[in-house]
Amino acid sequence: MRNVQAQPLVSPTEPMIDPFGRAVTYLRVSVTDRCDFRCTYCMAEHMTFLPKKDLLTLEELDRLCSVFIEKGVRKLRLTGGEPLVRKNIMHLIGNLSRHLKSGALDELTLTTNGSQLARFAGELADCGVRRINVSLDTLNPEKFRTITRWGDLSRVLEGIDAAQKAGIHVKINAVALKDFNDAEIPELIRWAHGRGMDVTLIETMPMGEIEFDRTDQYLPLSQVRADLASQFTLADIPYRTGGPARYVTISETGGRLGFITPMTHNFCESCNRVRLTCTGMLYMCLGQNDDADLRKALRESESDEHLSQAIDEAISRKPKGHDFIIDREHNRPSVARHMSLTGG
């Protein structure tokens, strides 16, 4: 058999630093605004999606991600929409995995609704994906269909099974929704921890126009934590995954539970991430409208120098924090664009 020498490991690159001294080491990339679900807190039922001609090609996404990695990004998360509905997405993931093999990237991961996981779990594992987040707000099939408008819970559970069998660590992300799933959060935690999965609870965020009043859905996680503390023994721990969640352990289950609280206790002081949309717009903050058009810089020159300068200029504008509020008087989102465009 022919000997194949391993690729030399790349020396870590100094990260980009924003105006407030925070290192930018985490890039979230929305590869599509399309999704096979229509979760009520995320999308309008009759969404108008971007024309496909406006989307970056997979080759352009690869080039952009690679420049960010050269500039010190160590964690790359693919999001959507639903990333696994993007045509030929595994071609992109397979190409990006070269940065894992070289040592330039610590982690390549994705956030998914789980609907396509049974199909792609094996390929994802082969590409070096070791952890994924699966969005799952309820274990009740009828409520699941209601919140997603037409999703099939059994298909998602099959996908989770496939991912775990492929050796991928699954974390469950659940949006806490008042009078919808608040009573079943303890059951969801027990189920996930019983399968070796962490859980992260998320406050609903005021992004994009939807048919429902978000003030009716909003549930502060401080209240959820207090309710959980009456049933479980919670202990704060310093565990971090590179994201904004603050974690506790639950003695009764032995598992970890995270809280993402953009409304009641924001995570801006340690923000290490920026977001790239499928059209090449870079958002320095989830809760601000300031953006940078990297598609223009990408297509103006085959050289990456101009693109690198555009990224530097954008990072120099990264704000100190977001402006999320729940506008109870006017029922308006703080940010007009939908999460499916920015990348959840």
UniProtKB/Swiss-Prot annotation:
Binding-site residues, [4Fe-4S] cluster 2: 268, 271, 285
Cofactor note: Binds 2 [4Fe-4S] clusters. Binds 1 [4Fe-4S] cluster coordinated with 3 cysteines and an exchangeable S-adenosyl-L-methionine and 1 [4Fe-4S] cluster coordinated with 3 cysteines and the GTP-derived substrate.
Keywords (A to Z) from UniProt: 4Fe-4S, GTP-binding, Iron, Iron-sulfur, Lyase, Metal-binding, Molybdenum cofactor biosynthesis, Nucleotide-binding, S-adenosyl-L-methionine
Binding site for S-adenosyl-L-methionine: 41, 81, 135, 205
Keyword match Membrane: no
Cofactors, names only: [4Fe-4S] cluster
Residues annotated for [4Fe-4S] cluster 1 binding in this entry: 35, 39, 42
Domain Radical SAM core intervals: 19-245
One annotated GO biological process: Mo-molybdopterin cofactor biosynthetic process
Pathway the protein contributes to: Cofactor biosynthesis; molybdopterin biosynthesis
EC numbers for this chain: 4.1.99.22
Pfam families hit by this protein: Fer4_12, Mob_synth_C, Radical_SAM
Entries under InterPro entries matching the protein: Aldolase_TIM, Elp3/MiaA/NifB-like_rSAM, MoaA, MoaA_NifB_PqqE_Fe-S-bd_CS, MoaA_twitch, MoCo_biosynth_MoaA/MoaC, rSAM
Recorded GO MF terms: 4 iron, 4 sulfur cluster binding; cyclic pyranopterin monophosphate synthase activity; GTP 3',8'-cyclase activity; GTP binding; metal ion binding; S-adenosyl-L-methionine binding
Binding-site residues, GTP: 28, 77, 111, 171, 273-275
Reaction catalysed by this enzyme: GTP + AH2 + S-adenosyl-L-methionine = (8S)-3',8-cyclo-7,8-dihydroguanosine 5'-triphosphate + 5'-deoxyadenosine + L-methionine + A + H(+)
Quaternary assembly: Monomer and homodimer.
Similarity remark: Belongs to the radical SAM superfamily. MoaA family.
Protein name: GTP 3',8-cyclase
Organism: Brucella canis (strain ATCC 23365 / NCTC 10854 / RM-666)
Upper classification of the organism: Bacteria, Pseudomonadati, Pseudomonadota, Alphaproteobacteria, Hyphomicrobiales
Encoding gene (name): moaA
